[in-house]
């Protein structure tokens, strides 16, 4: 670790077509084995499917879905005196967005369906409406944090 000060935070790049940082974050998380062009294809097909399903701006649906899934608080395991407690911790917006994207992709991978673009578009539309596996994961995390509120002083 450097003693001179903190390093500057890198700004997230935006994707070539929509010029959107969220789309680029999604592409980087869906990426497997360095196949970025395939990741872009999947995302753009999913965005087209969202456009066809909802007949609204697909980027606003994406934003709304990520905003709906982003957790405010999470639990972290902390060992205190021989026993492990789940300690509720508030998380920042960047980390919350990263968690939301991870949960959305995990939920869409679990879905039954033809291909990833179809599954991802379905999950994003459901999350924007307030349902789906990713929303359930967020609510479960918030319930865990609420149940372990007594351990908040261990932070």
UniProtKB/Swiss-Prot annotation:
Swiss-Prot/TrEMBL GO biological process terms: ribosomal small subunit assembly; translation
Disulfide-linked positions: none
Key words of the record: Chloroplast, Plastid, Ribonucleoprotein, Ribosomal protein, RNA-binding, rRNA-binding
CDD domains: uS7_Chloroplast (cd14871)
Gene Ontology MF terms: mRNA binding; rRNA binding; structural constituent of ribosome
HAMAP family reported in the protein's UniProt record: Ribosomal_uS7_B
Family per record: Belongs to the universal ribosomal protein uS7 family.
Complex and partners: Part of the 30S ribosomal subunit.
Protein name per the record: Small ribosomal subunit protein uS7cz/uS7cy
Gene name in the database record: rps7-A
């Amino acid at each position: 670790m450097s003693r001179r000060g903190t390093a500057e935070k890198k700004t997230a790049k935006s994707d070539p077509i929509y010029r959107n940082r969220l789309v680029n974050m999604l592409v980087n998380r869906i990426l497997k084995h360095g196949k970025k062009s395939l990741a872009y294809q999947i995302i753009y097909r999913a965005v087209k499917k969202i456009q066809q399903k909802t007949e609204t701006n697909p980027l606003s649906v994406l934003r709304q879905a990520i905003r709906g899934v982003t957790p405010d608080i999470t639990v972290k395991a902390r060992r205190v005196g021989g026993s492990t407690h789940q300690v509720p911790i508030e998380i920042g917006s960047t980390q919350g967005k990263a968690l939301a994207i991870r949960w959305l992709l995990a939920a869409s991978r679990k879905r039954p369906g033809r291909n990833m673009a179809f599954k991802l578009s379905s999950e994003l539309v459901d999350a924007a409406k307030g349902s789906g596996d990713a929303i359930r994961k967020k609510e479960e995390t918030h319930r865990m944090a609420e149940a372990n509120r007594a351990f908040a002083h261990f932070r």
